[in-house]
Amino acid sequence: MSIPICYLFNSFIYNNSAEAFFFAGCTTVLILALSARFMIKKKAPADPLFYVYAVYAFFSVVNLIIGLEQDNIIDGFVTFYLKEADPHINTAHGHMISYWDGCVHYLVYLLMIAAITWGDSYRAIGLYWVGSFLMRAIVYILGNAVGKYGTHVGPLFLLHMLYISVSVWACFRIFSQPSAQDIQLTSIQEAERKSLLHRPLDLLFIIYLIPALAFCVFRGLVALDCSSKWCQDYTQRYEPYLKDPSAYPKVQMLVSMLYSGPYYIIALYGLLVPGCEWMPDLTLVHSGALAQAQFSHIGASLHTRTPFSYRVPADSQPVFLLVNVLYTLVPQFLCYRCCFRPAFFCRPTPEKKSE
């Protein structure tokens, strides 16, 4: 429904037809109301997040349309919006955010809507979305505050702040949901008895976390304009995008250093000491945040909307892609391990002991 609505609204605005635009708006609201009533007339979901995510899914498709029109794949759907919207939407970072929201977030919203409809738990996928949303929101707000577009904040920025406020409320709703894990006592005891040498996968993750922490801190220092020759050479050869005046990449590296850095230390502790029940939730939030951040960073570093002097040089692209893709994927595997084999991180409850 988002596609025809975007096309009609864009056409009405360009034709300066106020009556037609008003009619289209009323018709859209009526169609959405009737559709929602028809779909949930038998049993309306009691969870208010059902309606929040339904609206978000609608706007995710709009964001996908924005990304496609920016790449000239389609035309005439959101032309007026691209001219009047906040300037950040036309940056490489905003461009990649549109694709992320239109693809990944759209899928996540559909999964959570389906889980609510069927009465299933959506806490895990919800925590992944929480991490992705928080990273996007923090970089957006701080990037607008310190970047070159800080003086171009318009009414749509206030609308975006409303979206962030509702999403923060949704985050608290997700965190308040109980965990659905049910692990046998024997499995927990068996996992706790294994030493690190008998957990080769965890050993590999620990070996990864140490250089990942160093890489995270190093890029944060680069974003802070460290005068070290290593930092200067790295910026010039591999990631000149960190110097982009929009400030989004610089803010993203600083956020990663301040939050991902401590996470890697905490994750090391969680993999070494049994009974850290918070480990699966923490990896879900972090993997969602890192996936969103790295997708935006990698895409914007190579995108044609980034000025040529700030793009990754052609001869450095293989190394850049290898390092950043590994830095993105390994935390996803760690999250998978913690969520689907959580016995090592669980504590036996008194009820399980009595059984």
Indicate where each model-derived feature is located.
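Hydrophobic transmembrane alpha-helical segments in integral membrane proteins
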Residues: M1, Y14-A24, L201-F205
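Alpha-helical transmembrane segments of multi-pass membrane proteins
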Residues: S2-F12, L213-C226
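Short, hydrophobic transmembrane alpha-helix segments
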Residues: F9-E19, A36-A44
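Eukaryotic polytopic
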Residues: A24-L34, M39-A223, K250-E355
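Perimembrane loop-to-helix junctions flanking transmembrane segments
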Residues: T79-D86, S228-P245
